[in-house]
Structures are given as structure tokens and as C-alpha cells.
Amino acid sequence: MSTPTPLSYKDAGVDIDAGNALVNNIKAAVKRTRRPEVMGNLGGFGALCELPTKYKQPVLVSGTDGVGTKLRLAIDYKKHDTVGIDLVAMCVNDLIVQGAEPLFFLDYYATGKLDVETATAVVNGIGEGCFQSGCALIGGETAEMPGMYEGEDYDLAGFCVGVVEKADIIDGSKVAAGDALIALASSGPHSNGYSLVRKVLEVSQADPQQDLNGKPLIQHLLEPTKIYVKSLLKLIEASDVHAMAHITGGGFWENIPRVLPENCKAVIQGDSWQWPAVFSWLMENGNIAEYEMYRTFNCGVGMIVALPADKVDAALALLAAEGEQAWLIGAIAAREGNEEQVEIL
């Protein structure tokens, strides 16, 4: 039996006009990220991008990521303008560790009912992240899926492609005993460990608006992930970088070994930097063991760089000039037998 009144897509919960309004709202953010290699404009079936002419043997490097349950906090506290930066950061920081310059980025935004204001804030944040990393936002997908998401909930995914000269790929193969380890400061928990963060908030019954070192706790927790691309591209050009590790899910124990040869281990001096207050707060209020902290969070270190010991002073000076806070935190040593590849003393 048919319905007596004609049905439309909007009656089913999908508002095409809202989608068009979103596209119109984000045009300026997209335009701001445009690179000379990008061909065509927003709205095509596919996005076109030439390879930069400076590369003789270009190798494409791709990555995809999300923001995890940090989104839950952002949605609950209506802080939508920075999770887009998180999304870009998680992707482009993974590319830079291999020496790749990010070229272009695409996003996927899914929700049950499209709120144009919220989505605009999110995508403008994505545009800001792309601008910070020199990456073109060339396309994306906004999926309005009634019945799939509750209330104002939404999810994000990002996809990034970069390029590196074949001879300049950084893969950890040059790492050797005696190399120094430099750490670049994080801006906070970045986008990892938020299921544990939310559990600590729940169990401790803490007020997220409470003051922590001069600003609300929730502001520490929603601080956008730091993007290291431009400063590290300059370091790569000026120095002899042997490896880089992006400290994400799995923390120190899981991420550092990903860039080390089997015969090497990282020996880190745990007192060589001070944990930001938010990590000490999480550890204390969640009664979290130190090992678990290093396994879950970046503990104030967003990126680790391995390079020859005689390059340390120049590298630290360059990073400081680029606005990075960085420290010498350890060295590479020879690994024997089945020793762990990361030691924190």
C-alpha cells in the first residue's frame, strides 16, 4: 500500500539543501589551502593533483586516521572547531616521519542529521590543519545517515597523500648505536588514549571545568594535536635525520620500535623532560601505573627524532627557531638478544 502523500529524501532524513549550504560555507577554508599542483575546483567527481616538478623520482606516501573518542568529549562540550586540526595532524604527522611532504587531504564526515553550523566548524578546522601543514584540502564526503548515529553525534576520518624523493626516504635503516634522540613537545594528549581519559573522568567524578595550571581541565584535554610538518621538513633539509617516531596509540613502547633496526634499542632518560600537568593529573586521578602511562599517552612528547650525536646542537637550535620546544632525551644503543627495544630510565 502506497503512502497518501508524496515522500522526499528530506522526509527520510537527508537534507540535500543543508549539504549544499555546507559546501558553500567551506569554500574559503578550502581555497586557503590550495597548492599550485591542484587542478580543478571543489565539487568534481574526483580531485586532480599534479606531482611537484622538483622531484626526480617521486614516491607517494599515503595515510589514513581518525580522532578516536576525543570526538566524544568535543561533542559533549560543543568544541567543534579544533577536532579538524586533530584529524589532519594524525595523518600528516604519520607522513612526515618518512620524510614525505603532504600534498593533499580528503575528509569523511558522517552524521545522523547534518547540522550545518557544527559541520562548518569541523571542516574549517580541517582547513586550518591543512594550512598549517602546507597540504591542500581537495575533497571529501559528507554522509548524512539517519538511523546510524544518535542525536548530534558525528564521526570523522581523514586521508592524506604526500611525496618524498626516493633517495631521501626516511625508514630507520640508517639508525645506529650512538645516535642521539631528540623529543619534540606535544600540545597535550593529542588524539590518543581518550577512552582512558574518559574513564578517569568517570571514575574520579572530576569536574572537567576545574582549574589545572591556569585553565580548565577540559581545555587541556581538547587542545588540538600539534602539527610538526613544516619544522621537521626544515630539519630534514638541514640535518641528517635517521628516523622519526610519531608517538600515538601505543605510546613509547609501541611506536619507537617501529623505526628501529632489530639490533638497536632506544635508551631514554625519563627525567630529561617534565610531563605537562594534564598527564600528571591523569596518572594521579586514574591511579595509572607509569608503564601504562607510557603505553597509552605521549606524556608530553609528540615526536622523537634520531640523528647523529654531533648534529644535536644545530638541530635543537633550528627547532627552537621554528617555535618547537625540544630536548635531548636519550640515545640509541646496541641491542643484545631479546632485549626490549625501548628502555626508560
Swiss-Prot record:
Disulfide bond sites: none
Pathway(s) the chain acts in: Purine metabolism; IMP biosynthesis via de novo pathway; 5-amino-1-(5-phospho-D-ribosyl)imidazole from N(2)-formyl-N(1)-(5-phospho-D-ribosyl)glycinamide: step 2/2
This protein's UniProt keywords: ATP-binding, Cytoplasm, Ligase, Nucleotide-binding, Purine biosynthesis
Protein name as it appears in the record: Phosphoribosylformylglycinamidine cyclo-ligase
Organism, scientific name: Shewanella oneidensis (strain ATCC 700550 / JCM 31522 / CIP 106686 / LMG 19005 / NCIMB 14063 / MR-1)
Matches recorded under CDD domains: PurM (cd02196)
InterPro entries: PurM-like_C_dom, PurM-like_C_sf, PurM-like_N, PurM-like_N_sf, PurM_cligase
GO biological process: 'de novo' IMP biosynthetic process; adenine biosynthetic process; purine nucleotide biosynthetic process
Chemical reaction(s) catalysed: 2-formamido-N(1)-(5-O-phospho-beta-D-ribosyl)acetamidine + ATP = 5-amino-1-(5-phospho-beta-D-ribosyl)imidazole + ADP + phosphate + H(+)
Family statement drawn from the similarity comment of this UniProt entry: Belongs to the AIR synthase family.
Gene Ontology CC annotations of this record: cytosol
Keyword 4Fe-4S in record: no
